[in-house]
Amino acid sequence: MKPINFIFTFVISFSSLVAQDYFPTNKGVKTLNSKQILITGAVVHINPLKQLEKGMILIENGKITDVSSSIDIPRNAVVYNFEGKYIYPSFIELHSNFGVPAIKGSSSGRRSIQYHANRKGFYWNDHILADYNSHEDFKYDPKKAKELRASGFGVVNSHRKEGIHRGTSLLVTLNDVQNNGYRMLEDRAAQHLSFKKSNTSGQYYPGSIMGAMALIRQVYHDAKWYANGGAKNKDMALEAVIKNQSLPSIFETSNKLDVARAAKIGNEFGKKYIIKANGNEYEQLNTLKKLKPQLLIPVNFPAAYDVDDPFLAQKLSLNQMRYWNQAPTNPKEIANAGIKFAFTSSDLKNVKDFLPNIRKAVQYGLSPERALAALTTIPAQLINQKGKIGELKKGALANLIITNGPLFEKETEIEQNWVQGQQHIIKPKPKKSIDGEYALNMKDTSYKLVLSKSEFKIDAKITQDSTKLKTTAKYINGWLTLRFSDSTNTKFAQLKTKINNADNLKGDGSFFDGTYVNWNADKVEQTKKEDNKKKKKVLQKVLPITYPNNGFGFKTLPTSENILFTNVTVWTNEEEGILENASVWVVNGKIKAVGKIDDTEGAKIIDGTGKHLTSGIIDEHSHIAASSINEGGQNSSAEVTIEDVINPDDINLYRNLSGGVTTLQILHGSANPIGGRSAIIKPKWGASDDEMLYPNADPYIKFALGENVKQSNWQSYGRFPQTRMGVEQIFTDYFQRAKEYKAAWRKYNNSSKKIKAKIKAPRYDIEMETLVEILDGKRFISCHSYVQSEINMLMKVADRFGVRVNTFTHILEGYKVADKMKDHGVGGSTFSDWWAYKFEVNDAIPYNGAIMHSQGVTVAFNSDDSEMSRRLNQEAAKAVKYGGVSEEDAWKFVTLNPAKLLHIDDEVGSIKVGKSADLVLWSDHPMSIYSVVEKTMIDGAFYYDLDRANAQVDQIAKEKNKLIQDMLQAKNGGAPTQKPKQKKSVEFHCETLD
């Protein structure tokens, strides 16, 4: 039996095949009509690594029953011959909201912030919606399904994009013929998470990314506790978390830093998240290699910027311009890094761009095999459907696309998409082409006829001499009909012909006057021009990334060197004081020798004649380099940590280096009495967030007093405390609860195994764990403070609970209570000369630092500001001006003293043998307003060099100019463009709510 070559395709309905056998029928005799389909002749790509040149696929009941080079044709089979075609598995989309309605946010404004959950019988936070199941609201969308099929998709995993814990998704095929019972492969396919709050509730917490991270962690702890019977009440959200824990977990992120953050949480709790990424992961591959995430990669490659206007072009950062150039390499770079990934279309404005952008990724180096895997087998594995979808094998769903060429070639088109054995025509079979220019003659009159697009929807143009005549055309079933007007547009002629020879058209019709007419049209030979040949598009040269991938980044990260500073004035901050014409030798990141040095074993020499060498500046109070600063959704946020949200790409880190800063503490803001945990970092420009963290540093936490925590200047008054008296009660209450929490765990841990088997473990509370660390002297307090009464209050509360406040920061009335601070053992990290910028600092004076210093308090000057942090050397000089502090002691205000407050003075803060080589070379006296930083060294490596910085200014200008020229060329070549938009940067301060 020969295969049948179908010219006209038809739809095969499987309703009789798949209808449940226990359903009654009242429309006739109940029969089983099991049709089989045999596809032959095509190149069949069984999976990304295996193909058959003349493959055959046998389909029955929506599934593949055989794939081979030779199959005996069943008697009742319908045979399709696709000779010359290519067949691939249909694609799988894992991150969609197909058919699931979105929730619109409330349009009514709230005067007061909502602090508590609305849902009863669920988790204490409304943004944990683990109990929601997307299949309950699913409604199949034929229009959207058609769009997705046209781009190659056969299966989508769909969920409602709402909340931090979003509940479950459903896995559904794009089969228009059947009902949801047949389409739905899994009603609970995966659970979904994000860092975004839901529109279903106005509950404020979490108000920051670090709050969202803490909440996710606490949910996991609570689910474990709940599963062990710890709760007295029923919590349907936690029950859903427990029920769904075996499902794949898909985590949506908004930027590259969030990808790593999500991966860290997953690794912490043994969850192998599938993380929906953002397209610029190539910028942090070293981090991702360590975390080993599974990724869903978008392909929304940016359009070139329209840089015709040079003033608008100035708004663009180098990173924005590089992203246009480098983004198409993202899939290749991720593949080369050995990271498992699948593609997603979810970030595209138009799904039609999906396959062209995949092809672009292949052009930029991604292998076709890896690209196909990311569309088929890998998403199938990730969603626990290996062998069922994503490949053409026995037992798998008959989901396949048929193309007219190799999938990743630019001109190849998807002609059909079969879903569960159901044929969907994407591109109808083309009609015989009659495109071309013809010389049309009738009644001794000549016309020019041009036909185009005849394979699909024909377009016709007729001109007489130079006059265009209004023309319409139809080309159906081999018959061509032309209708056109005369030059006056008042009379019409109508011609028709049956196409036999496309080079010579002959027919009859009616002339303008209504008389019968014969006509003919001979095709005009076109002269082929040499320059009309298609030229292969030359890809833009991809620029190398830097670390970080923006202005002033490094091509390779700095490493420690063997360096000898000679003939330099050395500010030791030790008993030796200031050494003239001295040397400092640095080896392996440490200071090896100070003073007169003879043998340096091949060190690189830096002549410091006329210059000054100091230890690096330490900023005890900073808010730079973080993605969020305040978690103000509760009156205590001890559960959050700045370490979660460090932003290593913040340009302020580089600017700090240019000001000689080598260590800084990024503090939580002052939105609540008990704030979050801080991060102590070294600004190693180009390193990852984890690599910047100060190793083995003591942990700190931010407390706050005054106007901010009682919301004096807020428009909402719904949160306790609202008075300074209430602030005192917050500290007392939380410390007491921490004591009781500690006692409960001690009692449980000290119990015998026999007793433990009969009782329930206490609930693990991240917030309480942090406060217990304070009670145990393992975590230290840095407290935002202004007014002496509150300063006294906190010291008294701390004494009552056996706690010592480590640092009062700001402390602008410290001069009033310096003696009490000395007795308590607390340091003061203050401003040099800030006063009268709000009511509670009306009594501030510029002599504050000097007075506290004279009373024996360890005093530091901090910045609390991204601008001031670059000139803390000048702030130190103000201690000499206001109060007559010696130059050496004043310099310690920004070096050794903050090191003492941070408990790292054994490693940094002075120039001493054995300490870390965190050094700054100044052009002049370090406290002079004329002095500039020439070099900044951290752990023996130069992270800032003035000469290099000056050279980079020119390099950046040249690179931006090249990218502008490339974008102009792309625009002239017809590429889409976008309007230049300046990338907004947020400057965080104590009161910034994010």
Predicted regions, residues:
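Polyanionic/metal-chelating signatures
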Residues: 140-280, 413, 419, 434, ...
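Tryptophan-anchored aromatic micro-motifs
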Residues: 39-42, 429-450, 455-465, 471-473, ...
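His/Asp/Glu-enriched, well-ordered alpha-helical/loop segment
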Residues: 28, 41, 103, 111-123, ...
